[in-house]
């Protein structure tokens, strides 16, 4: 459940920082003029994977491996990886690559500015629940996909997030 809340908070953050980035939408059969809009944000996958080209521009945030560990003498920590997939459309190849780079860079820069996402508490104050983890081995990576996909351009970014610690509520009794 906690990773679902992270995805929801990441979606809200992404929608806020991308709301003024207006990109071309692929023209569909029957369209008479080019439409433009901000990238839509989805969680885990597109609602209909067969419509990947029709949905561009978009960003998908997807949780990948979750790990919980506890080193001797230190607090338990849970880290989740999030793969963010970016996709845009542009009939001009140079503009398409630049639009993709712009989407990915805006997300990366805004994320590095705050390094946390969260929600609003019952008192109306902003609460940060999730911290970006840039510890050794958890670097922020971004890769534009190479390949002949024009006029669609895609790339991905991997981020790591520290989740709140789950508190043990029951004592463990071992059989003897």
Q: What annotation goes with each model-predicted range?
A:
Residues 62-91:
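Active-site-adjacent structural patch at catalytic or cofactor/ligand-binding sites
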Residues 48, 67-75, 137-149:
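Catalytic micro-motifs at enzyme active sites that drive phosphoryl/nucleotidyl and oxygen chemistry
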Residues 101-168, 176:
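Acidic-leaning, charged glycine-interspersed low-complexity segments
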Residues 68-72, 89-95, 163-172:
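Short, cysteine-centered beta-strand-loop-beta hairpins and adjacent loop/turn segments enriched
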Residues 1-72, 174-176:
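Small/polar-rich, solvent-exposed N-terminal microdomains that initiate assembly or binding
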Residues 84-85, 90-108:
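Long, charged/polar, surface-exposed segments that mediate recognition or autoinhibition
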Residues 59, 80-82, 155-159:
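Hydrophobic residues positioned within well-ordered beta-strands of beta-sheet architectures
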Residues 53, 74-78, 99, 147-153:
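A generic structural micro-feature
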